[in-house]
């Protein structure tokens, strides 16, 4: 008889397609001695329920839950309000919705399985309430941890948690975290901040392979990730995404009922402001250079090349990247200025430095 691993997910209709890819990948890599009981919290339409139910197999069982608070009274940080909504707070309902379950793995839907998660189920959590992985960025920011009232020196990413639901309920973790969020009118990193405050010194830190985030992968700290987390703005379902495990997501999705769905584009408010300034300054078109081949630079290049035919990108500048993107050459510096109307600065944190560098040798307009 197969042992059961309980897994909880919190989604809305927009993320059903990505959850399908995740669940399929979990089942594909799972040991034959186990089965997954997938608990999906979300107010989903009939089409998505039907498609997710089609994932059912010998080692995958699927259940749906929608009887829990909507959490709409809790604000979302301005840092995330263009890509997150109240669904991020649904995880607080897991212990009560799954009142007969004592242990569950919570996994964000923007992840993909590369290996077998079954060994996770046998981890001895000792007295810990959750087992987690350090956040790839905030885990190193001790100053911000202190500001948040976290004295443990550790900060975890809440997109993956092995939860002891018995201890969670006994310690009223959801209630404590929700009270903190309400009393503080939200936090910069929403539920993740609240959980790090409430759970400090009550967590077991695991190897990064269980929640392999971009900086972990960039540093090559992980030889064989089990769960890859596409955290951040750029996702593998974006047409311009560059990620070492993008294909793992696409292959898994292609084997689900969502196989024919197209890839997506995404622009945040800063992207739209940059493009608006470009159009206002050069309404009849322009020859431009894009400075920065990172996520924002790729988004802007894609939008300009595909949807703004009056504007041409002559080349891209990035001191850390070589090659090309969408047929546009990437250089390490300004290589020619003649005929260029403007430079779009996609590396916003370094905008002032870049403007100073451009101003030294040219009179180009900086957007």
Language model feature labels by segment:
Residues 6-8, 105, 204, 287-291:
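Conserved beta-strand elements of the Class I
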Residues 258-367:
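Hydrophobic, well-ordered beta-alpha structural blocks that scaffold small-molecule cofactor pockets
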Residues 25-33:
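Short, acidic, metal-binding catalytic loop of nucleotide-sugar glycosyltransferases
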Residues 130-150, 234-254, 258, 319-321:
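A short, conserved beta-to-alpha structural element at the edge of catalytic cores
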Residues 68-70, 87-138, 153, 162-163:
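GT-A fold catalytic core of metal-dependent nucleotide-sugar glycosyltransferases
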Residues 35-43, 132-134, 314-319:
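Short internal beta-strands
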Residues 55-96:
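Active-site-proximal specificity loops/subdomain of glycosyltransferases
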Residues 1-14, 18-21, 158, 163-277:
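A glycosyltransferase accessory/donor-loop signature
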């Amino acid at each position: 008889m197969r042992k059961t691993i309980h897994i909880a997910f919190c989604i809305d209709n927009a993320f059903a397609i990505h959850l399908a890819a995740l669940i399929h990948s979990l089942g594909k890599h799972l040991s034959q001695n186990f089965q997954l009981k997938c608990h999906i919290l979300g107010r989903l339409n009939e089409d998505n329920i039907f498609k997710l139910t089609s994932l059912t197999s010998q080692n995958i069982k699927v259940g749906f839950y929608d009887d829990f608070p909507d959490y709409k009274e809790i604000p979302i940080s301005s840092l995330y309000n263009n890509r997150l909504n109240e669904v991020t707070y649904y995880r607080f309902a897991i212990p009560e919705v799954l009142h007969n379950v004592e242990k569950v793995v919570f996994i964000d839907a923007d992840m993909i399985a590369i290996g077998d998660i079954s060994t996770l189920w046998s981890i001895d959590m000792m007295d810990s309430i959750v087992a987690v992985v350090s956040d790839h960025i905030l885990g190193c920011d001790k100053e911000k941890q202190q500001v948040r009232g976290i004295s443990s020196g550790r900060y975890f990413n809440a997109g993956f948690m092995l939860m002891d639901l018995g201890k969670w309920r006994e310690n009223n973790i959801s209630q404590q975290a929700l009270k903190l969020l309400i009393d503080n009118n939200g936090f910069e990193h929403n539920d993740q901040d609240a959980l790090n405050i409430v759970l400090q010194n009550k967590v077991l830190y695991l190897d990064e392979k269980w929640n392999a985030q971009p900086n972990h992968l960039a540093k090559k700290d992980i030889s064989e990730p089990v769960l890859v987390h596409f955290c951040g703005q750029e996702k593998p379902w974006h047409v311009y995404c560059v990620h070492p495990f993008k294909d793992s997501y696409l292959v898994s999705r292609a084997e689900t009922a969502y196989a024919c769905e197209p890839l997506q584009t995404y622009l945040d408010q800063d992207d739209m402001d940059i493009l608006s300034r470009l159009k206002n300054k050069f309404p009849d078109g322009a020859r431009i250079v894009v400075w920065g081949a990172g996520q924002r630079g790729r988004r802007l290049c894609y939008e300009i090349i595909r949807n703004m035919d009056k504007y041409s990108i002559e080349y891209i500048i990035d001191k850390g990247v070589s090659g090309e993107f969408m047929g546009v050459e990437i250089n390490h510096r300004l290589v020619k200025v003649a005929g260029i109307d403007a430079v779009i600065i996609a590396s916003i944190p370094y905008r002032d430095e870049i403007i100073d560098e451009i101003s030294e040798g040219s009179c180009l307009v900086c957007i």
